[in-house]
Amino acid sequence: MASTPSKSSRSSKEAYSEVAIGPYTRLDHIGKGSFATVYRGVQTKSRTFVAIKSVNLGKLNRKLKDNLAMEIDILKYLLHPHIVALLDCLETNSHIHLIMEYCALGDLSQFIKRRDSLKDHSYTRHMISKYPNVSGGALNEVIVRHFLKQLASALRFLRDKNLIHRDIKPQNLLLCPAPKPAPTQSEAEPQIVPLKGSETSFTPAVGLETLPLLKLADFGFARSLPATSLAETLCGSPLYMAPEILRYEKYDAKADLWSVGTVLYEMVVGKPPFRATNHVELLRKIETARDRIKFPEENPASDDIKALVRGLLKFNPVVRMTFADFFENDIITGPIPGLAAEDVPIPDRPPSPEVIPTESAEPQSVSDTIYPRNNDAEPKEDRYPPPHRYVPHNDRPQTPTSSSPMRRTRSGDRPSSAKQIPPAAAPPRPEAVSHATAPGRQELIGRHSSEQQAPGTVPVYKNVDKLKEERELAAQEVAFERDYVVVEKRAVEVNAFADQLAYDPRFHGKQTGALPRRQTTPALPTTQASSQNSPRKAVQVVSGRSRADSAHNRHASYERRYGQSPTSATSAISKALNMASGRLFGVGFSPPLNIAKGGRSPPLAYNPFPAYPTGHAGLLTMGDGARAQASPDEDTRTVKELEECATRSDVVYGFAEVKYKQLIPLAPSSQSYNSPNAPGTNFEEGELTPDAAVTLSEEALVLYVKALSLLAKSMDIAGAWWMRKNRAEALGESSFSRLEPVSIRINKVVQWVRSRFNEVLEKAEFVRLKLLEAQRRLPTDHPSHPNNLSLESAGSGTSVDVMVSPGVTAEKLMYDRALEMSRAAAINELTSEDLPGCEIAYVTAIRMLEAVLETDEVQPSGKGTDKVTLDGVQGEEREVLLKLVSKIRMRLATLRQKLAVLAKRQTPPSSGKMIPSNLAHATPATPATGMATPR
């Protein structure tokens, strides 16, 4: 840890205002996570220290609120010396304040990174003098074994309660000063006394009393998981995730053991065993290693430590070390070798009535000898004077709170649980630089500044390797700066299904290779390495698809192309939207905005489905390339339905991109879709007022959510087809060999859908945050201010309870835009102006109206839809929309006849066979769906 700051630096850090939160006083800020800010605080009466974790309810969606409630419920009953206790829980209108035990030494991550300065810290000076950090490693092995014993004790306690933590990492392992202070510590040094959750909160169950006490924190992802159960939600921190979680597979409590192995490796080596700039690359490195965990040659780790790490870091959870084997390992149960003389346990200590032996599995260690408790002594919090700085209660700003039904009693006010030992009276401890209750990563100050090389002993190539390693580490920390990755169950299902199809050998009989897994990440151009941001973004939901109008020729491949030229981003949809924008957006926008100010719209990153290319490819081709007669069988209908649904989603996506581009005039490739305060998003809005920002954000958000629902339905269609094919093949009724063209095409659409869904999800989350930010900047009397919006107006399709203005719906926006585009196209058609553009506008309007009529669920065949409500579209309204679509199709058919005549006139007479153009290939729409089979 860094040395204690000087008075001058400390005075600058104390420039904060004390805030009363119930019976506690909030002091300085000590850490920040994705959704919470951690403050140091004190109990107002006793002046004992606590950590106050303030969670901003406005940043939480429904899933994260459930996680928070689960965390509170779990922590209420977790009373263990090596688990951070929840002391109290207070709630206000905007925040929930978790009052936690205060851990003055911060987290294990900072402890490892600042290991070279531990010798200068008053809390750790004596420890380092006894157990110095050796060259080529991170922490002394005595300290490593001590921390591992305490972590294992916490995990054993959780397993006894059928709990899985799911986010074990150094940042969630907090450290407290040694329960038995070093004899060299001066009583004149600054003193700090934490408020205890129980009498045994700071009495180690295992390990040494002369070394820091480790506590497991942050149970936001913890859940009850019996030994025979499997979970499927992807959560945790990527660097410490088990590979089965990274692969979107179901997992059990053994996922925690992988995380323990990564933490143990980092304590020994100083860095995680696998590092990468994104979770897909991380999984690739884990798979490539093939269970060969390498340690640096100069690392002095013992063989049994290396064997334990390798047993924990098994790729296959079936062959990974079990909890029983881990808890019975000699490193966990045996004595710690290499102890200093003062820490060696006394073997023949006579028993005393006041000595209570622990139930630990290592009777010969110091951790099993609990010093007698002086029952006549005062509680610790009454033995020490309060801190010097004190503000009278009346002078502090008040924060009205309402205590939750749970308020944890402290010290002797409740019965002790199993394995709880009365603590020994300890002398005062000085204050340390604090970092408590699992705060987020802080900036690293002077990284590697204390590392020195012996002169004349390091070759030049080692310096180059060191520089490369530092760059890789920097890139990794930027990519994983966010604490969490949270993916909803739907996201896991979609990505898992897309991966299953991508790697199925039956789809690649005549292809050069499988599709790359990297498309699992959101398809954000030029920033794919950092696109899987979540979390610390809030929540991610995954699914997706899209396609082009059947009346146009296109490539059969649906793989995305991220060209930077204007032509690569130009499509029929973008042309149609731009045409309508140029003529109608001046009055169609609310509030009116000049689209030219936002630059190109849709932005250059927009790649439509399937981009309306000039090449021609049929729906189904046989092995010799000849066109097959597409029979209206079930598989052909599935392809048609899948592509139509994907195309509708793409039209909605293009409309949302227009709004997004006006809201954020920068290219999406330069954006970070995590937070309104993220780098690259603090743009000067210029003439974009808060009212305009709210309007654009609301419209973009509801359109993105509509696109997500259509993409999800596309994946459901493909999933149902996949289940039918597997069932039929298992029964011997069909074979994939004769359906290879269909299956390959569906596979490509699924991969496109997955990529587009991830991209839309990221942008929707960013727009949501921009909406919340813009709403807060509105005047309090504005109708769109959060205080003036009711729950009834909240967007029902969003991933969180975002309050949008009444009447702002995707269906209304899409209907108005389709009507504007069709009217403008009709006027141009009458004046014979830009007839190809008129066709594009008609097709886009039809697709947009079909998206309005589209339901979110796959409807069974033959189910009536008359006089029913479907996704907010009433039966009568549905009839009106169907009539409008029919009229636009009639105009489209008339226009295509006119275009065919013009194309025939322009054909040279010498040509014996007319070469059809993109428009000439169009066929009349089928009555059932309004779409012909794509050609």
UniProtKB/Swiss-Prot annotation:
It catalyses: L-seryl-[protein] + ATP = O-phospho-L-seryl-[protein] + ADP + H(+); L-threonyl-[protein] + ATP = O-phospho-L-threonyl-[protein] + ADP + H(+). It is a peripheral membrane protein. Residues 397-406, 922-935 have a biased composition (Low complexity). One of its GO terms (molecular function) is ATP binding. It holds the Pfam family ATG1-like_MIT1. ATP binds at residues 30-38, 53. GO terms for biological process: autophagosome assembly; cellular response to nitrogen starvation; cellular response to potassium ion starvation; mitophagy; piecemeal microautophagy of the nucleus; protein localization to phagophore assembly site; protein transport; regulation of autophagy. It is found in: Cytoplasm; Preautophagosomal structure membrane. It is an enzyme of class 2 (transferase). Gene3D superfamilies: Phosphorylase Kinase, domain 1, Transferase(Phosphotransferase) domain 1. Residues 375-385, 546-562 have a biased composition (Basic and acidic residues). SUPFAM superfamilies: Protein kinase-like (PK-like). Residues 518-535 have a biased composition (Polar residues). It comes from the Eukaryota. InterPro entries: Atg1-like, ATG1-like_MIT2, Atg1-like_tMIT, Kinase-like_dom_sf, Prot_kinase_dom, Protein_kinase_ATP_BS, Ser/Thr_kinase_AS. Coiled coil: none annotated. Homodimer. Forms a ternary complex with ATG13 and ATG17. Serine/threonine protein kinase involved in the cytoplasm to vacuole transport (Cvt) and found to be essential in autophagy, where it is required for the formation of autophagosomes. Involved in the clearance of protein aggregates which cannot be efficiently cleared by the proteasome. Required for selective autophagic degradation of the nucleus (nucleophagy) as well as for mitophagy which contributes to regulate mitochondrial quantity and quality by eliminating the mitochondria to a basal level to fulfill cellular energy requirements and preventing excess ROS production. This is Serine/threonine-protein kinase atg1. The gene is atg1.
